[in-house]
């Protein structure tokens, strides 16, 4: 009987561990943000982000658009180079979702998965072109509530640990902060790069410490 109970407990523990959700850990020089996903409402966006993160696609990219009261935006591979002016113009989906040329990954985009989740502080949402089905790898995290974004961009996650990191990032120096009249394409791009790495791990592991 004791052996049976032990086996049952082991089985329950195994099932519990196997069902544990994955989260993303976005690490910067200011600390880590732990993000939970919403696969039930934005499955393609979660899948694409997860694929790219596991590939190391985001590692070394930056938050190239930092706007207090709005968002911090990143995920563009162009931000890995030394040209500040091309940041925000690159990216691709993690796999072929039916948009773009299947044999050309650089053209892959994600169809819109607009939902009822609100854009509040810590919301993880996907940037896109003017095309509703024009999301790639670029994402943003809200640093304030932005109801004007609700239903216009796909929310696919939420920061559950590390909100203070957002507060530190939005206080970095940018061309706009130094010169309100500046209108270059890098107007909100920090002078000192805010680089990131993104790892996918189990919730319990990410929440340690």
Model-identified regions with their sequence ranges:
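Cyclophilin-like peptidyl-prolyl cis-trans isomerases
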Residues: 15-209
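Sec-dependent N-terminal signal peptides
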Residues: 4-14
């Amino acid at each position: 009987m004791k052996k049976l109970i032990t086996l049952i407990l082991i089985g329950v523990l195994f099932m519990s561990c196997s069902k544990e959700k994955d989260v993303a850990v976005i690490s910067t020089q200011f600390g880590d943000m732990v993000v939970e996903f919403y696969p039930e409402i934005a499955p393609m966006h979660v899948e694409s982000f997860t694929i790219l993160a596991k590939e190391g696609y985001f590692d070394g990219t930056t938050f190239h658009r930092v706007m207090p009261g709005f968002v911090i935006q990143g995920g563009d591979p162009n931000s890995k180079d030394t040209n500040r002016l091309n940041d925000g113009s690159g990216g691709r989906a993690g796999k072929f979702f039916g948009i773009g040329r299947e044999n050309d990954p650089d053209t892959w985009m994600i169809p819109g998965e607009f939902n009822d989740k609100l854009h509040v502080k810590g919301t993880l949402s996907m940037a896109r072109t003017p095309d509703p089905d024009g999301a790639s790898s670029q994402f943003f995290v809200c640093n304030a509530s932005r109801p004007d974004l609700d239903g216009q961009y796909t929310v696919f996650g939420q920061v559950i640990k590390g909100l203070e990191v957002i507060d530190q990032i939005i206080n970095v120096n940018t061309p706009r902060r130094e010169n309100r009249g500046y209108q270059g394409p890098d107007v909100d791009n920090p002078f000192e790069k805010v680089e990131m790495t993104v790892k996918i791990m189990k919730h319990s592991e990410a929440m340690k410490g």
